[in-house]
Amino acid sequence: MHVRSVAAALLLGLAWACSSGPSAPDDAAYTTELNAARITKDEAFRSASDSPVPEGKRDAVLPLPYFPVDPNYAVPAALKLSADRPVFEMPTSTGALRRMQLVGELQFTLQGQPRSLGAFVEEGTQQIDRLFVPFADLTTGKDTYSAGRYLDIQPTGTGYYTIDFNRAYNPYCAYNASYECPYPPPSNRLDVEITAGEKAPGA
């Protein structure tokens, strides 16, 4: 979906965008854990040989900017599976098309309104180890990156998740135009401000 080889363990820690069930986090411990993961990501982006942030830009880009942690943006969701996993050709930042299959729709309530986001995998994926959820919202192009943000979701056996927008992150093309990053499809554009997660670089 996108190149993200920097500190794989870091991204597992940072991007557990959804857990195995809809339990609410303990606010203090949750905030502490999330802030620690953000510091770890900054350190990796600053020092890793395969950092997506060009060396000459690191002082300007790092530390990465975020909205304050808000547990209200960690919401329970149910995954409605797609019967036939239709293929979508997602435009990308390089102009190429990325063929993705829709696994299903994550259905949830946010700010009192029912909403949904499509969850995708690369075409031909046999064993799903993560679901890819690109999205845009009313902060896109303002406080957040103009091409949208991503969530990574670990599949569960129950079909129930916790979507955590505090863990929304920028695609690598936000820092370096040489990366190819899929754009969120129109169906994954939320008509609400998601003031959680990573902001646009330099915001």
Describe the role of every protein-language-model region.
Residues M1-A8:
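Bacterial N-terminal signal peptides that target proteins for export
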Residues L14-A17:
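C-terminal motif of bacterial Sec signal peptides marking the signal peptidase cleavage site
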Residues V87-P91, T156, S187:
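Terminal leader/tail segments of proteins
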Residues V133-Y169:
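Acidic, glycine-rich flexible loop segments
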